């Protein structure tokens, strides 16, 4: 089969996905996918080794699933989306060099970028639109008809993670400590959160959350419990959800205004948005209040499709 042989990667903390596809006669011909290990922040201890292992393992699996031998998988270009990779930074260059080394192709045929950009180019390959990712963290990014892109959020949970599962869990845990102090009446939320963390005192909570392996994911695991209490009428839990939804509406409005999108199409992604239905409803209500002409749509493709689109652009080709 003729055509360009391309690889797209979506690198996450738990796993990395690779999709192989051919671009032939102006259409995509999917070949195979593979799952590999997860990544951590590239500048963390063992970050580079974990990143390279994730790329190699997922690519090897995809090649095997395609019934090919690695020496026959001659990639024309590749792109990877991973959380925390900022445009035009040394980290982006480092990630691109690693991708090139893994696939044995020139670095100018590789692109490493944030997973929000691969999600955007997957959901809206050619059209204007905004992608929201509300999972452990939160970020949104949009593009207008002139091709200008604008991002909002995604600055890390220590600085700006309103609108995320981490934010819901952390605010809920803070609320539980106020209950333990007697500042507000004790309610079932405190007991449920502490039980989930296997803690029986405020001092145990304090010691737990500073452990290196707790972090954003540790708070995020508590989000469903906060949502559940909001559903049964806990007013403070409801307020946490409403404030977090407001943060998302604020970010999406900022992107839309910056790009001149008066009636933006929005595609929502991420575990908090997709699986915490009451939270999702509040997000939709908050955005409808700020931008009544906005509409929610299902994206044309996923982050791997977006990675393949960006890989093709490395060859100065566009799927038009």
Give residue ranges: language-model regions.
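ATP-binding/phosphotransfer module of carbohydrate and carboxylate kinases, centering on a glycine-rich
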Residues: 1-71, 122-128, 175-320
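Conserved phosphate-binding catalytic cores of ATP/NTP-utilizing and phosphoryl-transfer enzymes
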Residues: 1-2, 107-131, 148
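Short glycine-aspartate micro-motif
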Residues: 6-10, 75-79, 129-133, 140
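Short beta-strand-loop/turn "lid" adjacent to the catalytic site in phosphate-handling enzymes
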Residues: 40, 59-102, 112, 121-124
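Glycine-rich beta-strand-to-loop/alpha-helix junction loops that act as flexible
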Residues: 79-85, 134-136, 266-274
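Glycine/charged-rich beta-loop-alpha catalytic/anionic-binding loops adjacent to active sites
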Residues: 100-105, 148-156, 286-295
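Active-site nucleophile and cofactor-binding loops and adjacent substrate-binding regions
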Residues: 109-118, 133-134, 295-305
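Glycine-rich phosphate-binding loop of actin/hexokinase-like ATP-binding domains
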Residues: 127-179, 183
């Amino acid at each position: 089969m003729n055509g360009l042989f391309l690889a797209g990667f979506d690198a996450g903390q738990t796993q990395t996905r690779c999709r192989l596809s051919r671009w032939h006669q102006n259409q995509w011909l999917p070949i195979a996918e593979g799952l590999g290990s997860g990544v951590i922040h590239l500048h963390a201890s063992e970050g580079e080794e974990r990143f390279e292992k994730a790329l190699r393992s997922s690519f090897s699996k995809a090649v095997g699933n395609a019934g090919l031998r690695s020496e026959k998988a001659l990639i024309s270009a590749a792109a990877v989306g991973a959380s925390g990779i900022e445009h035009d930074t040394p980290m982006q260059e480092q990630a691109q060099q690693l991708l090139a080394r893994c696939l044995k192709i020139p670095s100018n045929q590789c692109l490493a970028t944030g997973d929000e950009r691969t999600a955007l180019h997957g959901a809206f390959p050619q059209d204007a639109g905004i992608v929201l990712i509300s999972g452990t963290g939160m970020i949104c990014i949009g593009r207008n008809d002139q091709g200008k892109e604008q991002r909002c959020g995604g600055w890390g949970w220590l600085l700006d993670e309103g609108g995320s599962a981490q934010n819901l869990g952390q605010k809920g845990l803070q609320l539980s400590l106020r209950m333990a102090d007697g500042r507000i009446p004790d309610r079932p939320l405190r007991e449920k959160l502490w039980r989930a963390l296997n803690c029986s005192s405020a001092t145990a909570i304090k010691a737990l959350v500073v452990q290196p392996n707790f972090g954003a994911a540790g708070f995020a695991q508590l989000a469903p419990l906060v949502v559940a209490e909001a559903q049964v009428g806990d007013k403070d839990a409801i307020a946490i959800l409403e404030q977090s939804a407001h943060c998302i509406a604020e970010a999406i409005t900022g992107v839309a205004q910056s790009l001149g999108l008066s009636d933006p199409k929005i595609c929502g992604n991420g575990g908090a948005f997709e699986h915490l239905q009451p939270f999702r409803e509040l997000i939709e209500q908050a955005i409808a209040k700020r931008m009544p002409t906005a509409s929610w749509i299902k994206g044309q493709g996923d982050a791997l499709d977006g990675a393949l689109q960006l890989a093709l652009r490395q060859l100065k080709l566009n799927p038009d």
